[in-house]
Amino acid sequence: MRMCRRVVTVLALSLPLAAWAEVPVVDDNAGSYPPAGYGTSGAYAGSGASAPASAQGQLFMQLQQMQDQLSRQQGIIEELQNDVSRMKQENLERYQDLDRRINSGAAPAATPDNSSGGGASNAAPDAAAGAAAQQPAGSSQPGDPAKEKLYYDAAFDLIKQKDFDKASQAFNAFLRKYPNSQYAGNAQYWLGEVNLAKGDLQGASQAFAQVSQKYPKHSKVPDSLYKLADVERRMGHTDKVKGILQQVVTQYPGTSAAQLAQRDLQKL
């Protein structure tokens, strides 16, 4: 009887242990360290553990936007640098062209056609015929050739000195004082050259245009028209350039200005 009680007692005590052993152990964090919700230090981070990743994404986007802005600004700077380089090159070419014209025999003229400068003129007529051709309609006031030449030479010397501001003023004053001078056509042309050297494209355009308008028979007309086309191109008036160049080629064949105009037409 006593033995039966012991067996029953052992069985009663072993049943909970057997049931506990049958319950499977599930590890939700198997294979991961640290466990979810905990930082690397072991401290619990809570549900906001994903916040640092979001902040890093925003920072990356901001940096990307800044990089894009810097790239655009760099492109603008490069364009401006190219424009400045082009303008410097054009100014240098204008000065060099002016020097060539001065040094190639384009000195102050003893007659209206001795100062052809660009080589675009044909054989020069005599001084009397040239002076008559330059006089606008209705003008018959006599001049003083010696005094006119003195004023003209003084203005031209300012070009040689590269004092373009004073040269422009001097040629303007000469044309106001001696509009019918035998040197007026030359003065009008060189006024255009001086204004171009100064970078005054509007003034250069007006001066070159007036050579053919006021002195249509003057030997400077082909050169002045060709230079006018160049100025209009610089000002962006491409619609006018082709017509002016065609006028030079058609009306003044055989001149160096016509040859240059033909070359430029082929590039348009």
From Swiss-Prot:
Signal peptide coordinates: 1-21
Segments annotated as TPR repeats: 149-181, 185-218, 222-255
UniProt keyword annotations, A-Z: Cell cycle, Cell division, Coiled coil, Periplasm, Repeat, Signal, TPR repeat
GO cellular component: outer membrane-bounded periplasmic space
Family annotation (InterPro entries): CpoB, CpoB_C, SecYEG/CpoB_TPR, TPR-like_helical_dom_sf, YbgF_tri
Low complexity compositional bias, start-end: 121-143
Subcellular location: Periplasm
Paired cysteines (S-S): none
Any one of the GO BP annotations: protein trimerization
Keyword Repeat assigned: yes
Pfam families membership: TolA_bind_tri (PF16331), TPR_21 (PF09976)
Stretches the record annotates as Disordered: 104-146
Coiled coil: 58-94
Protein family (similarity comment): Belongs to the CpoB family.
Protein's recorded name: Cell division coordinator CpoB
Organism: Pseudomonas putida (strain ATCC 47054 / DSM 6125 / CFBP 8728 / NCIMB 11950 / KT2440)
Gene this chain is encoded by: cpoB
